[in-house]
Swiss-Prot record:
Residues 1-27, 99-147 are annotated as: Disordered. This is Arginine vasopressin-induced protein 1. It comes from Pongo abelii (Sumatran orangutan). The gene is AVPI1. GO terms for biological process: positive regulation of MAPK cascade. Keywords: Cell cycle. It holds the Pfam family TC1.
Length: 147
């Protein structure tokens, strides 16, 4: 069958491509030639509360291999995000809890409570009607057959 083209065209693994030979070699410590203010700014932008102290430690110990290993494991800190409500809790976010008031103390609050109860009852009734609106009944089925 022959040799696949991808195998023939790839260079041997021990030979680096020509564009890679001209590149600067990677350093284990990325902060080796950085200034203190640059390191502080980097930590501040990542949201670190102790940015100045961490930058000072890294700048002083730039040649230490333990610091280089710690920097590899360092991940960018993000402020905690507010999680969106789940589907099951989303409808509960619109519910209101009515504070209990004594009807004798404030006659206006009693009328407000009554009007709120009427409002909630009408909402429930309209939701029930909407739910039942599209349910097929025996008359709608016969109507479809005749036409």
């Amino acid at each position: 069958m022959g040799t696949p083209a991808s195998v023939v065209s790839e260079p041997p693994p021990w030979q680096a491509p020509t564009e890679a030979r001209g590149r600067k070699q990677a350093s284990a410590n990325i902060f080796q030639d950085a200034e203190l203010l640059q390191i502080q700014g980097l930590f501040q932008r990542s949201g670190d509360q102790l940015a100045e102290e961490r930058a000072q430690i890294i700048w002083e110990c730039a040649g230490d291999h333990h610091v280089a290993e710690a920097l590899k494991r360092l991940r960018r800190k993000r402020p905690p995000r507010q999680k969106p409500l789940g589907h099951s809790l989303h409808h509960c976010s619109r519910l209101r809890i009515l504070e209990p008031h004594s009807p004798l103390a404030d006659p206006q609050s009693a009328t407000e409570t009554a009007s709120t109860e009427q409002y909630l009852h009408s909402r429930r009734k309209s939701a029930r009607i909407r739910r039942n609106w599209k349910k097929p009944g025996p008359t709608s089925y016969l109507h479809q057959i005749r036409h």
